UniProtKB/Swiss-Prot annotation:
Region feature (Disordered): 123-155, 407-435
Any Pfam family matching the protein: Ig_3
Positions annotated with a glycan in the UniProt record: N111, N231, N255, N293
Quaternary context: Interacts with FGF2 with a low affinity.
Role noted for this protein: Has a negative effect on cell proliferation.
Keyword Secreted listed: no
Gene name per UniProt: FGFRL1
Name of this protein: Fibroblast growth factor receptor-like 1
Biased composition (Basic and acidic residues): 423-432
One Gene Ontology term from the biological process aspect of the record: heart valve morphogenesis
Tissue: Expressed preferentially in cartilaginous tissues and pancreas. Highly expressed in the liver, kidney, heart, brain and skeletal muscle. Weakly expressed in the lung, small intestine and spleen.
Residues on Extracellular side: 25-378
């Protein structure tokens, strides 16, 4: 039967109400409020950049500046739950800031461009102790400017670890008026290595090659001119080849279950002396080796290498990486491995992904089956009955069309002539009809077109036993009664009962 239109209107709200609100809200992070992409800050002031994102589960936020991750080592920067706070803004703080929020269903980025304005008028800078000496000041001194670093984004990483035999470059590119000079020191002592005496155009970079353990220490660049001085310090750790292989910390990755077509993720945290290589692998199930161009062996099993995203450096010295799986299918189910490797070896940990079956498997449209069952019962019964009636009528017509016309009755026997095949009575030697004649019966000359028997010519007629291919069956019961009188003759009384059954 056809569903009611009212039911069709009420069905979607009922289905939506069957799911709890919490389940319906789960998904990737989304914006909770609008933001102004261009932010302006005054030199020396404090600026706050908001990251108004929300999601279920709550997302993990990470801030970057010009592509470099902001961590606790940045003294003037503080990552707060509401956003990023920058104190005592400097000129080099200008740049592109990105807040990236990630949960198990996806990620969202909020971008800012920070512009730093200098509200200090030229000529009001302190000129140093020698400014109080007498004499005529150079008119150009009114435009003097203290040195400043021009590439602060390349100086964020102040703690550097390198193995023996490697190299490192320390940069302190600066500008000012007059043109500043730079001096490199190690552990507060002037450098005597040849690397410190490079050509003028490379003086802003200190290159340390073929590192040795004694190269470990604090390296400081001091940039100065008549207007002032600035400095920056790097800590270099030269380690004797990595002492241990990476270690996977925490409980991740963990076994995960996802709905068909849903989104989920695995995460992996690796602790290593140097930045490790983190790679995700998926085990190739038996019989599916031909689907992949290349596989690798790990622990005696075959795995396929999956695309791996960025490796994030955390303030505690560990490294984090996530594997995102979208639009999960049955092929995505199986064992996944997080592999962390460095020059000393590798460590791995496995987890399983379970993909729930598709609640709506492909099949024939439901409307076709419902329309077939919605027919009224009289129609369902009447169609087969009509077909049977038409078929019976056709069969009857064919049966009548194949019947032959009436056959003429046989001629009566000549008087005094004994037909062959007659028998004698035991007592009176009277003639009796033969079984063949009786079996032929008086119905030999029946007209089959009318379906009624013709009157017999003679009970013992010798007519030939022949009939059409389609003929009525004749069953004859003969009851013979013999009465013996005192006279010498016998009387035969024959009673014939004919049962005619027409069969096509």
């Amino acid at each position: 039967m056809t569903p009611s239109p009212l039911l069709l209107l009420l069905l979607p709200p009922l289905l939506l109400g069957a799911f709890p609100p919490a389940a319906a809200a789960r998904g990737p992070p989304k914006m909770a409020d609008k933001v102004v992409p261009r932010q302006v800050a005054r030199l020396g002031r404090t600026v706050r950049l908001q990251c108004p994102v929300e999601g279920d589960p709550p997302p993990l936020t990470m801030w970057t500046k010009d592509g470099r991750t902001i961590h606790s080592g940045w003294s003037r920067f503080r990552v707060l739950p509401q956003g990023l706070k920058v104190k005592q803004v400097e000129r080099e703080d200008a740049g592109v800031y990105v807040c990236k929020a990630t949960n198990g269903f996806g990620s969202l980025s909020v971008n800012y461009t920070l512009v730093v304005l200098d509200d200090i008028s030229p000529g009001k800078e302190s000129l140093g102790p020698d400014s109080s000496s007498g004499g005529q000041e150079d008119p150009a001194s009114q435009q003097w400017a203290r040195p400043r670093f021009t590439q602060p984004s390349k100086m964020r990483r102040r703690v550097i670890a390198r193995p023996v035999g490697s190299s490192v470059r320390l940069k302190c590119v600066a500008s000012g008026h007059p043109r500043p000079d730079i001096t490199w020191m190690k552990d507060d002592q002037a450098l005597t290595r040849p690397e410190a005496a490079e050509p003028r155009k490379k003086k802003w970079t200190l290159s340390l090659k073929n590192l040795r353990p004694e190269d470990s220490g604090k390296y400081t660049c001091r940039v100065s001119n008549r207007a002032g001085a600035i400095n920056a310090t790097y800590k270099v750790d030269v380690i004797q080849r990595t002492r241990s292989k990476p270690v996977l910390t925490g409980t991740h990755p963990v076994n995960t279950t996802v709905d068909f077509g849903g989104t989920t993720s695995f995460q992996c945290k690796v602790r290593s002396d140097v930045k490790p290589v983190i790679q995700w692998l998926k085990r190739v199930e038996y019989g599916a080796e031909g689907r992949h161009n290349s596989t690798i062996d790990v622990g005696g099993q075959k795995f396929v290498v999956l695309p791996t995203g960025d490796v994030w450096s955390r303030p505690d010295g560990s490294y984090l990486n996530k594997l995102l799986i979208t639009r999960a299918r049955q092929d995505d189910a199986g064992m996944y491995i997080c592999l962390g490797a460095n020059t000393m070896g590798y460590s791995f940990r496995s987890a399983f992904l379970t993909v729930l079956p598709d609640p709506k498997p492909p099949g024939p449209p439901v409307a076709s089956s419902s329309s077939a069952t919605s027919l009224p019962w009289p129609v369902v019964i009447g169609i087969p009955a009509g077909a049977v009636f038409i078929l019976g009528t056709l069969l009857l017509w064919l049966c009548q069309a194949q019947k032959k016309p009436c056959t003429p009755a046989p001629a009566p026997p000549l008087p005094g002539h004994r037909p062959p095949g007659t028998a004698r009575d035991r007592s009176g030697d009277k003639d009796l009809p033969s079984l063949a004649a009786l079996s032929a019966g008086p119905g030999v000359g029946l007209c089959e077109e009318h379906g009624s028997p013709a009157a017999p010519q003679h009970l013992l007629g010798p007519g030939p036993v022949a009939g059409p291919k389609l003929y009525p069956k004749l069953y004859t019961d003969i009851h013979t009664h013999t009465h013996t009188h005192s006279h010498t003759h016998s009387h035969v009384e024959g009673k014939v009962h004919q049962h005619i059954h027409y069969q096509c």
